[in-house]
Amino acid sequence: METIHFTKVHGSQNDFFLVDEEENHITEWSDEKRANFAIKLCDRKHSLGGADGILYVTKSSEVGPIGQMRVVNSDGSIASMCGNGLRTVARYLLEKHALTDAKVETMKAILDVKKATSLGFDIPTYQVEISPVKFAAETLPMHVGVEKLFNQVIPELDAELAFSAVSVPNPHLITFVDQAVLDSNKQEKLASYLNSENPYFPDGVNVSFVKRLSDDAIYVRTFERGVGFTNACGTAMSACSLIKKMLDNNILETPLNVYNDGGRVQVTAKKDAAGEISLQLIGNATFVSKGSVRYENDIVTELTNEATAEQAQYQALVKEVKEFLKTTE
């Protein structure tokens, strides 16, 4: 029998159980055990309400970063990156080490994180780096007959929609649409197909439909690989922001407001001397509750769960966002 302590967290209502492997003495768990635990704990029918995944936090394998984040989705699959999750991990580790900025190791890169100015309503807000950014088909991987997909119709996917693809480093397929397409079932049908066995994206892909709201604002809805529709996907919002800036010839460094069903974030971008692009995702890092479970014979049983006051703060932002989005329909 094992007792596992957790913090229930969310970034833009993309929710997770954050589990510190060192404090729980589970650093020797196998990947299979981590996956099985995630499947059980993240079940939406569980008494704790489930989650989109587990953020396993442990020591970095490199010198410099203050910790490492590993993301396991609710279906047990591994995500190479999660922007919303990284903001909450950034907060957890920065508070643990009494810092305001540092580096955190993820599966594909070591990324800068720091505390940021609040989005409003006294919401804890953090900024995290999203990189590397790659457009080559092999980095997704993608097989649609082109080496780089940018604002192009792919008849096999849809006869009318123009798609762009980018890895950040997890793969994203993005198209800009109007409200009528958002209201249709096109996204669900396409995303479900591309995340089952198919010849175009053999490893699956995150599929985002984006609506322009103004010169400095977009709305993003994402079907996440391994999860399905979520309130928000941090890497998707970052990737969509970059594509918008490229399509509209926007200044990379200018903040873009990104609205989603889970709230609002800001995204900026920059290009270094070598021409490499990196993104900065700025948004909430909300701690919903702290608790513990018993894990025995592949069964997860709730022991404790104490809520914080932070969700009420975030819901004030959500109310503001919903009222704004109504005016854009």
From Swiss-Prot:
EC id: 5.1.1.7
GO biological process: lysine biosynthetic process via diaminopimelate
Binding site for substrate: 14, 73, 83-84, 170, 206, 224-225, 234-235
Keyword Cytoplasm: yes
Cellular component GO terms held in the UniProt record: cytosol
Primary enzyme class: isomerase
GO molecular function: diaminopimelate epimerase activity
Catalytic activity: (2S,6S)-2,6-diaminopimelate = meso-2,6-diaminopimelate
Oligomeric form and interacting partners: Homodimer.
Protein family according to the UniProt entry: Belongs to the diaminopimelate epimerase family.
Function field: Catalyzes the stereoinversion of LL-2,6-diaminopimelate (L,L-DAP) to meso-diaminopimelate (meso-DAP), a precursor of L-lysine and an essential component of the bacterial peptidoglycan.
Protein name as annotated: Diaminopimelate epimerase
Organism annotation: Listeria monocytogenes serotype 4b (strain F2365)
Encoding gene (name): dapF
